[in-house]
């Protein structure tokens, strides 16, 4: 059992820690940060997200969330119309009116986010000042914050990063030694991790963001935080500015990634090796057995990642090491080397890496490689399927619970399912 659990895996040859990266600066095809509201409004259960944007923003949110507006979801769009764009209306006065009406109708709201968009940035609407002004009117009943979900030079997962970074200055101060798990994960996954931490004797443990506005975790010099998502660079910097220290680790995708993630935490909190093995061992073995069936379908297959979610590097590591797949290119919108250093060290040596997007050039390389599966955005999937390539929507890997041991097989299945579908269609 020790051989299974006490792993400090040698990198595949020399890994990709110092590998050259192709920097692309061309045409892009990505969703904007507003997409993050879809999972954030489910995570923070008494928060409301008010997008200040266009009808296009409203259509995107409603379509992505799959929620009809008459169901009164905890998000909405304050539409910027022609009068606002022409400067004929006082946008701040209109915003105050909308917020006042919203909070009168929805007394259950405890935290309100004013979310900037491309249109609000174009007309230079200062939502941070608006949030301060409105907070004075509605405090302490409602906390009002602002962040940007604009798609200008960003990708869709950065909406969560800017949201959490805006929350960090509002967190209470604490000197207590504690663990903070940073990044939105499904409630069921959070509960699973909490049981593991309880078994290891690690505590107190806080998850950020919390499920309720009043339960946001404290932060200070005693805080040790570990990222659950690789796209939280601004949030990590904000926490470090508050005195917290980040624990470097691979991300908890797959049996190996989850074990190494927990191992980094256990080391920091001086968990005995025997206890770690007894708590983590059965869970890892169960995950490894569940993954074995999927490995037979994926081993030796080629995978190509278009830059979209910033999950690409950890997912490539999982597919290469645990599923036996061959990454022919791993493209990511932004390569934060410091955050993914542990992942890069575990990638197969010589794996082509690219940062940014030049869509036409990447399409040419993808067509030339003829991978067995392509991980890409929604806009590319159907055209590539029409060319005979099998695709997986990258946004599905964000929406689906894929962290931890119990979800490892679900993560693998997201890649086997498109291949099975293609096989049935051909037959």
Swiss-Prot record:
Which GO biological process annotations does it have?
A: light-independent bacteriochlorophyll biosynthetic process; photosynthesis, dark reaction
Q: Name the cofactor(s).
A: [4Fe-4S] cluster
Q: How does it assemble?
A: Protochlorophyllide reductase is composed of three subunits; BchL, BchN and BchB. Forms a heterotetramer of two BchB and two BchN subunits.
Keywords, sorted A to Z: 4Fe-4S, ATP-binding, Bacteriochlorophyll biosynthesis, Chlorophyll biosynthesis, Iron, Iron-sulfur, Metal-binding, Nucleotide-binding, Oxidoreductase, Photosynthesis
EC number(s) of the enzyme?
A: 1.3.7.7
What is the UniProt remark on how the cofactor binds and its stoichiometry? Binds 1 [4Fe-4S] cluster per heterodimer. The cluster is bound at the heterodimer interface by residues from both subunits.
Recorded hits in InterPro entries, A to Z, give: LIPOR_BchN/ChlN (IPR050293), Nase/OxRdtase_comp1 (IPR000510), Protochl_reductN (IPR005970)
| Pathway(s) annotated for this protein in UniProt | Porphyrin-containing compound metabolism; bacteriochlorophyll biosynthesis (light-independent)
Keyword match Nucleus: no
Record's family?
A: Belongs to the BchN/ChlN family.
Name of the protein described by the UniProt record: Light-independent protochlorophyllide reductase subunit N
Q: Name one GO molecular function term.
A: 4 iron, 4 sulfur cluster binding
Specify whether Ribonucleoprotein is a keyword of the entry.
Answer: no
Q: Which gene encodes it?
A: bchN
Any idea what job this protein has?
A: Component of the dark-operative protochlorophyllide reductase (DPOR) that uses Mg-ATP and reduced ferredoxin to reduce ring D of protochlorophyllide (Pchlide) to form chlorophyllide a (Chlide). This reaction is light-independent. The NB-protein (BchN-BchB) is the catalytic component of the complex.
Q: Where does [4Fe-4S] cluster bind?
A: 32, 57, 118
State the source organism's domain of life.
Bacteria
Q: Which reaction does it catalyse?
A: chlorophyllide a + oxidized 2[4Fe-4S]-[ferredoxin] + 2 ADP + 2 phosphate = protochlorophyllide a + reduced 2[4Fe-4S]-[ferredoxin] + 2 ATP + 2 H2O
């Amino acid at each position: 059992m020790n051989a299974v659990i006490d792993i400090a895996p040698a990198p595949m040859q020399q890994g990709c820690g110092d590998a050259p990266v192709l920097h692309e600066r061309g045409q892009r095809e990505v969703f904007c940060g507003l997409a993050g509201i879809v999972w954030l409004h489910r995570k923070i259960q008494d928060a409301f997200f008010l997008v200040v944007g266009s009808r296009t923003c409203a259509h995107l949110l409603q379509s992505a969330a799959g929620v009809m507006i008459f169901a009164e979801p905890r998000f909405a769009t304050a539409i910027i119309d022609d009068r606002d764009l022409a400067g004929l209306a006082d946008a701040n006065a209109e915003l105050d009116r909308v917020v006042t009406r919203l909070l009168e109708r929805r007394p259950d709201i405890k935290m309100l986010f004013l979310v900037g968009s491309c249109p609000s940035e174009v007309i230079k609407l200062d939502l941070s000042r608006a949030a301060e002004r409105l907070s004075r009117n509605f405090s302490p009943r409602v906390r009002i914050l602002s962040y940007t979900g604009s798609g200008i030079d960003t990708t869709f997962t950065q909406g969560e990063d800017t949201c959490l970074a805006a929350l960090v200055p509002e967190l209470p101060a604490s000197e207590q030694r504690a663990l903070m798990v940073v990044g939105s994960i499904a409630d069921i996954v959070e509960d699973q991790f909490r049981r593991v931490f309880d078994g290891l004797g690690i505590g107190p443990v806080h998850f950020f963001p919390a499920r309720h506005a009043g339960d946001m975790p404290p932060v200070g010099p005693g805080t040790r935080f570990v990222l659950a998502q690789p796209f939280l660079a601004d949030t990590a910097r904000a926490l470090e500015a508050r005195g917290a220290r980040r624990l470097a680790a691979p991300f908890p995708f797959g049996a190996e990634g989850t074990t190494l993630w927990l191992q980094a935490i256990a080391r920091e909190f001086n968990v005995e090796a025997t206890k770690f093995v007894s708590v983590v061992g059965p869970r890892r073995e169960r995950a490894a057995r569940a993954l074995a069936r999927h490995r037979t379908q994926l081993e030796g297959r080629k995978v190509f990642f278009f830059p979209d979610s910033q999950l690409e590097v950890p997912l490539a590591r999982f597919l290469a090491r645990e599923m036996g797949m061959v990454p022919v290119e791993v493209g990511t919108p932004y390569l934060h080397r410091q955050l993914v250093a542990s992942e890069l060290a575990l990638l197969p040596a010589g794996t082509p890496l690219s940062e940014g997007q030049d869509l036409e050039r990447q399409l040419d390389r993808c067509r030339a490689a003829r991978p067995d599966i392509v991980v890409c955005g929604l806009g590319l999937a159907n055209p590539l399927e029409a060319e005979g390539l099998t695709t997986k929507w990258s946004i599905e890997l964000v929406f689906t619970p894929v962290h931890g041991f119990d979800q490892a097989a679900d993560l693998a299945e997201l890649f086997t399912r498109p291949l099975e579908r293609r096989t049935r269609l051909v037959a």
